[in-house]
């Protein structure tokens, strides 16, 4: 296990654009930290910097209080799982698992013990004599993880390891990875663009945008109290609803007080009360545009004046296009932001 510290990390390429700009981050010993953000935000570059596959332009990287900026990747005691499984196709599962250990001249008895332990842990014992092409996608991903686990590294790095799997298998593997990390207690960093993966796996979550950190916190802290418009919009499915303060006051009046800096309001799709409760908050008289059934209820696209909202209804609606849907958003369920700064007010 290990503690990781990144101090004022900058990564700049020849075009003078900072891929990562003045980033500071601490990962606690044994913590599972998930970095989430859109494509191009710098999350995979950050992982590669920690692994030693990319050099920083400036800043300091520490593992257990030891500066490792100039350490070679092989000397950092870090193991990485990639999106493509990176297995040797001509080797058996056993051969893939033992390859790195043999290169490090690990005693044969120790190799056999480690492989037996990992094969049992990952439930790949029946596949040890098979080659990768004889395995399913999920089985190959388990082998890829097994290959890094047998090394017993200080740090695990996961670079979108589940993106090649179908939705059902991805959900299952999320649970398996979380259980595995809890068992091993190895400091882990996991990169994904999938917010559901991030919220499922993370002890702590980092939301990145354009090379900087927008917010750090537990998944529920970030969901319940987004610090910026970007975080509010990026985290949550269906996405949050935004409303211009002037539009609200134009149609409904000044129903509650908020700071002068507030010009954007937002509410989560599930944070509504069906019906009219004017004593609890603004009432929206809307028309249904589209209903998306989800089994336990439905997501409804509604129109209020010229604004579209998505609301999460916990019942099966039989209404159709153009029919009325009235709901209330309580005062405490509004998030408030400043458009110019993008920050929460």
Curated annotation (Swiss-Prot):
Coiled coil: none annotated. The complex is composed of two ATP-binding proteins (UgpC), two transmembrane proteins (UgpA and UgpE) and a solute-binding protein (UgpB). ATP binds at residues 37-44. Residues 4-235 form the ABC transporter domain. GO terms for molecular function: ABC-type glycerol-3-phosphate transporter activity; ATP binding; ATP hydrolysis activity. This is sn-glycerol-3-phosphate import ATP-binding protein UgpC. Its EC number is 7.6.2.10. It catalyses: sn-glycerol 3-phosphate(out) + ATP + H2O = sn-glycerol 3-phosphate(in) + ADP + phosphate + H(+). It is found in: Cell inner membrane. GO terms for biological process: carbohydrate transport; glycerophosphodiester transmembrane transport. It is a peripheral membrane protein. Belongs to the ABC transporter superfamily. sn-glycerol-3-phosphate importer (TC 3.A.1.1.3) family. It comes from Bartonella bacilliformis (strain ATCC 35685 / KC583 / Herrer 020/F12,63). Transmembrane segments: none annotated. InterPro entries: AAA+_ATPase, ABC_transporter-like_ATP-bd, ABC_transporter-like_CS, ABC_transpr_MalK-like, ABC_transpr_MalK/UgpC-like, Mo/tungstate-bd_C_term_dom, NA-bd_OB-fold, P-loop_NTPase. Part of the ABC transporter complex UgpBAEC involved in sn-glycerol-3-phosphate (G3P) import. Responsible for energy coupling to the transport system.
